[in-house]
Amino acid sequence: MYRVAIIGESLGAQVAALACAASGFHDIHRLQGSRHPNEQPQVYSLGANASRLLRALVPESIEGLGFQPDRRQVRFAKSAYLLAELPLGEFYQQRYGSPLVNFSAPALTAYLEEEIGNPLKNPMSLSDAETSHQLTVLADSERGIKACDDDPSFLIYHASLPDHPLRKANVLWRGKGQYVEQLADNDQVHFRFITRADIPFDPEQWHDSLQDAFAAKMQVGGVSLNGFTASETLFAGRVAYLHSALAPTSHIRVDADNTALEDAWVLSRMMENYEEDIGDGLAAFERFRRPRHRKVAAQLRDHLLKLTEPSVSKRFSQHVGMALQNRLMPELALAQQDWLYEHDVIKGFR
């Protein structure tokens, strides 16, 4: 097999290294990317579409490091009234074939580094990497995770606390054109705050149990709606781009970049199948993954606009529809997430 360079330090970059090694690539050079160590995420939440890849590559990681929440809840910001709830845990695993798992990002990163056993090397320019390797995989945006749009329409904050009364659930708190994602790993409870740039957070409009999180929150980035247009090009020359290199670097959902893990698996299998026909392999990778990128971009944009809806009447309509659907037609509510979690890139690429 030929020489492969993987640029980046994200989870997608690590999975790319593991997947390429599993596909028979042994001359793999891992290069530091643009992310500063202090800018790495604090938590990963892997749905079945991503956790099944870890189970295939490093099965011990889920049992040893992962925290499996037992339900997903939607609650009102101030009253904490339970608007909707769907089961996770064993029910979710039986439906999709793999669990939804939350990880401490530093712990999972350190564990995978040991499993990879191939230390990161000093940064190299993309052009130099392409010159000295037959295949280059760009896994991180060259702008860095804190890079925002010049005029971001939405701001993103993060906080971590030792505990919370609802730590066993993944909770979406819905406010007035704002929302908070809450999820726990084995050690901490994490909160991701998203708001329109012109609507600052008012802690008094949120539940008492969130006050410590509001006091601890720090801005981690911002995004514009322009960032939710899927790239039509997933490779250039002999450089392949994972989703994490193309999407907004500040994520409006904590699991927004799990698509990069799917890309890493498919790319490794495509290049194994096409052997020395690198150009044909990259073209096949692009054809296979481009529809998924389009779907994810459209869904993320819809997710952001829906949860930051400024109109009171439109939010009320959303709340009524969500409550009725989850209580009277839970199967329909589950079916609406199947597109994300049923997606199994392992099939056909073993």
Q: Where in the sequence are the language-model features?
A:
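Histidine-centered metal-chelating micro-motifs
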Residues: 158, 178-181, 246-247
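C-terminal helical "tail/cap" subdomain of flavin- and related membrane-associated enzymes
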Residues: 1-2, 63-64, 269-350
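Conserved hydrophobic helix-helix packing surfaces used for dimerization/oligomerization
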Residues: 4-6, 28
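Conserved FAD/dinucleotide-binding core of flavoprotein oxidoreductases
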Residues: 84-86, 91-96, 104, 162-230
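Conserved N-terminal helical subregion
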Residues: 2-4, 47-166, 198-200, 346-350
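Acidic/histidine metal-binding catalytic segments
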Residues: 64-66, 206-224, 278-284, 296-297
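Glycine-rich FAD pyrophosphate-binding loop
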Residues: 21-42
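Conserved mid-domain beta->alpha element of the FAD-binding
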Residues: 6-23, 224-306
